[in-house]
């Protein structure tokens, strides 16, 4: 079983805990995060993804950063491959944050459940692979060390912002 996630903002503690538990069960998890370096053309602090990434790295989850070059990786995609069981593709407008998932923002998501050889599942898998791996002519992502932030101050700042809702993510 494999779980591939490509997301603009990841900060919801229950989502992070579920991803960590899945990895502990042996699910191969790959997470592709926006480095939160730019938000709509304005330089950012990296909160929340750079801090949340520490929890993923500590759980031995594979992580890469979208190489945004001044833009944002605005996708919100989760793809679960389950061998002979149906695949699940979740995509839409919701970030994996408390504001988005706890009904504080109006969001719309779609879950597509189909056989692993379904054309839409295949296209979603190919898009994730293209973004995860780089080629000689296409560069979409960079390794985990590029944006990792080990600052305890910013980690707890992000946790307070997520818990309180005093944030825009």
Where do the PLM segments sit?
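PLD/PLD-like phosphodiesterase catalytic module centered on the HKD motif
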Residues: 2, 12-169
């Amino acid at each position: 079983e494999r779980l591939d996630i490509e997301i603009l903002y990841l900060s919801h503690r229950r989502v992070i805990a579920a991803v960590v538990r899945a990895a502990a069960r042996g699910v191969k998890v790959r997470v592709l995060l926006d480095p939160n370096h730019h938000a709509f053309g304005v330089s950012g602090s990296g909160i929340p993804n750079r801090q949340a990434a520490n929890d993923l790295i500590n759980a031995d989850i594979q992580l890469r950063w979208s190489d945004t070059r001044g833009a944002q990786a605005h996708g919100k995609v989760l793809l679960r491959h389950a061998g002979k069981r149906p695949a699940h593709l979740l995509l839409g407008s919701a970030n994996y944050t408390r504001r988005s998932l706890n009904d504080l923002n109006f969001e719309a998501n779609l879950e597509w459940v189909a056989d692993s050889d379904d054309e839409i599942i295949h296209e979603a898998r190919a898009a994730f692979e293209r973004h995860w791996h780089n080629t000689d002519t296409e560069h979409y992502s960079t390794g985990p060390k590029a944006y990792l932030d080990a600052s305890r101050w910013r980690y707890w700042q992000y946790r307070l912002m997520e818990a309180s809702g005093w944030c825009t993510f």
